[in-house]
Every structure is written in C-alpha cells, then in structure tokens.
C-alpha cells in the first residue's frame, strides 16, 4: 500500500477532510478504526479503506485547507499525551494484524520507524516517559526486534 508507506514516512501530509469514500467501502472495511482520542485513527482507517477498495485515487489540484484551532482539536492537545501514546501502541498492534503479510518488509519497518520518530519528537513534543517509550518500542518489536531496540535506544538518549 504505497499511500500508507508514504503517509508513515511523512511524504504525505493529509487530514481526514481530504478523503472521500463510498458507503460500500465504509461498510466492507468495518467503518472507522477506533483508537483513544482518535489518535492514529485516520491513518488506520484510510489504510483499511484503501485495502478494501484496491487503492486510493489522488485528485489533481490544490491541497485542501482547513482550520486546526489550537486547543480545539483533541488529538493535538498536550493534555492527552499519555492517551495519544497508548493509541500509538494500539495503532502499531493494529498494523501488525492488518498487514501481517508484510511483517518482514524492510520498507514498512523503515516507514514505521519514521512514523514513531515523528510522533515521539514532534507530535508529543518529547512528552513521554520511559515506560511509554518501552511500550511503543515493544509494539514495533512485533514487526522487527532490531527496529524496536534501535527505536528505544535512539529515543532513550533524551532521558539522559
């Protein structure tokens, strides 16, 4: 799923309002994927929809602009960092189950490491504890143990 890999690697910067889908796809995929605070839910949902639809079609033109008011979007609120980290772990577990055929795919492992890096350092602004880092690393370990330990030790240095 090229769209998913590009999204995980940060090559696509998109928001939920930019996706259009049919009721048929929504029903066949089981609706929206639910995680706490809707964190990672859009990425998981679009991946599931794309899998059921056989891909995603991009329309040419200008990107969609929408307002993201600071403090009004629960997913961006620093007060929910613990919930967001837990949702990230659930997302990684969901990815492992949904894409079990690609567990050993180096491109997927790299994309997941990029995604985790972005979440820990940018989205969560480094507001997480060692237990949270361990949890995310172990969830990644369900794909690749080496990537899990690399991720853990790379981010562990922030606690020193």
Set out the residue ranges of the language-model regions.
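Residue-level detector of alpha-helical secondary structure
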Residues: 89, 96, 113-116, 153
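Short, conserved alpha-helical segments within structured domains
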Residues: 41-42, 108-112
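Membrane-interface aromatic/basic loop that binds lipid-linked glycans or pyrophosphate carriers
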Residues: 120-160
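Conserved nucleotide-sugar donor-binding catalytic segment
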Residues: 1-79
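A general structural signal for well-ordered secondary-structure junctions
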Residues: 32, 55-56, 101, 118, ...
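Alpha-helix C-capping/helix-to-loop hinge sites
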Residues: 11, 29-32, 98, 102, ...
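Amphipathic alpha-helical repeat scaffolds of TPR domains
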Residues: 110-122
């Amino acid at each position: 799923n090229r769209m998913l890999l590009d999204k995980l690697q940060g090559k696509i910067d998109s928001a939920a309002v930019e996706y259009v889908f049919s009721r048929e796809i929504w029903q066949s995929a089981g609706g929206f994927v639910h995680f706490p605070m809707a964190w990672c839910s859009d990425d998981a949902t679009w991946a599931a929809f794309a899998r059921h639809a056989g891909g995603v079609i991009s329309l040419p033109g200008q990107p969609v602009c929408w307002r993201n008011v600071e403090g009004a979007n629960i997913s961006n609120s620093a007060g929910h960092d613990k919930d967001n980290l837990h949702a990230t772990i659930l997302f990684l577990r969901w990815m492992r189950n949904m894409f079990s055929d690609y567990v050993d795919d180096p491109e997927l492992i790299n994309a997941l490491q990029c995604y985790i890096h972005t979440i820990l350092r940018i989205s969560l602004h480094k507001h997480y504890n060692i237990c949270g880092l361990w949890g995310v690393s172990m969830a990644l370990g369900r794909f690749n143990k080496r990537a899990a330990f690399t991720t853990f030790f790379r981010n562990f240095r922030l606690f020193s």
